[in-house]
Amino acid sequence: MMVTTRSELLDVVYHFYPRGVRCTERSNVPPNGSFYDDTEEHRRLVEAANRGRAEYPTWKAMIRRLGDRYGLQNESLHLLAGGGDPAYSARIWLTDETALSFHVSLLGPYYGIHLPGIPEEEPVAREIAREIEATYPGYRPIPAELGNEVVPDVAMDTVLMGEATIYMCLFSVVWTWVDPE
């Protein structure tokens, strides 16, 4: 198995997110200033989301298989509506009040499973990992010590400069929706 490095992940982030450009309305950008939506990086992010829409049936089949066994909520419907999400995302309910989320990046061969920190999560997480790796050969998880690292010079639609993590950039702000207990 290939080892995922910080440098590799930052290269992917910077390929899809412009450094030092705030994500704001065009009317708030000074004349001759950089506008986020006009950058080459943003264009590549939109292209990745377009590929994600085209390849959505693969994701849908995988989450249908998981949904046959677990209470599953697809968090990727925004992508189908034209959103620029960087990953497919879903949530599996472990209890009435606790869920884990998982994400398959559209920006590189990575996935993440965000665990809430309860005993019931381990067998479910293993099954999700097996399903992702069978559906998306070559994809690998991002270790928490790398994924939680803040990318100081990147902003996202709903995340201010200096607050986005590698996980958020490669998966989605949906990553933050599961809080460990």
Q: Language-model segments: what does each one mean?
A:
Residues 2-136, 140-141:
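Extended, charge-biased low-complexity segments
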Residues 136-181:
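Acidic, proline/glycine-rich low-complexity IDRs
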